């Protein structure tokens, strides 16, 4: 297994992995990204995200997408892990852990105070995987979101 930073040539593979994650999460209908969107997000003039990929026999079979964050509480930068996904036939081979290990190396190099992400309550194997690496699972925290319609609605309201 080779873990490396994503390259522009990987855009189609990135999209296939993200589609696989959306299927795994049961939210494929929410996936609107295209290969061009991926190329722009990761390799455009102002990249929005980063990624590591896992390769087996020169085939991309796993991914960790992430971006930089900042914690005011600990006054340090951090990383938000957006997606961690390995195709099912390559699971239980240490590939997810290898991706996480490389992400931790990046976090250490950049003096990050933490890496954050979400994991579904019903994803028992994912929760166990993360806890096996020393992660804390915060049951009391709820993920919140404003979608595009809510953002536009709130932004257009009078002060």
Task: List where the protein language model places each region.
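A short beta-loop-alpha structural element at the N-terminal edge
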Residues: 2-16
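Conserved active-site alpha-helix within GNAT-family acetyltransferase domains
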Residues: 97, 101, 121-140
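Conserved beta-strand in the GNAT
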Residues: 53, 59-68
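Glycine-rich acyl-CoA binding loop
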Residues: 54, 92-100
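A short helix-loop-beta-strand connector motif used in the catalytic cores of GNAT acetyltransferases and
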Residues: 40-53, 80
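Conserved GNAT-fold acetyl-CoA-binding loop/helix
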Residues: 15-41
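Conserved GNAT acetyl-CoA-binding A-motif
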Residues: 108-118
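Conserved beta-strand-loop-alpha-helix junction that forms the acyl-donor binding cleft
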Residues: 117-126, 145-148
């Amino acid at each position: 297994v080779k873990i490396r930073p994503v390259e522009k040539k990987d855009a189609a593979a990135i999209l296939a992995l993200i589609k696989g994650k959306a299927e795994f999460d049961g939210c494929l209908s929410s996936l609107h990204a295209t290969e061009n969107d991926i190329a722009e997000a990761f390799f455009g003039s102002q990249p929005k995200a980063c990624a590591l990929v896992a390769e087996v026999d020169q085939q991309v079979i796993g991914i960790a997408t992430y971006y930089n964050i900042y914690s005011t509480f600990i006054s340090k930068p951090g990383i938000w892990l957006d997606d961690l996904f390995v195709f099912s036939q390559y699971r239980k081979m240490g590939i997810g852990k290898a991706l996480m290990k490389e992400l931790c190396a990046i976090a250490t190099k950049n003096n990050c105070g933490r890496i954050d992400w979400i994991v579904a309550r019903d994803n028992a194997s994912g929760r166990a995987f993360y806890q096996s690496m020393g992660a804390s699972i915060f049951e009391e925290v709820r993920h919140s979101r404003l979608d595009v319609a809510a953002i536009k609605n709130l932004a257009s309201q009078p002060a």
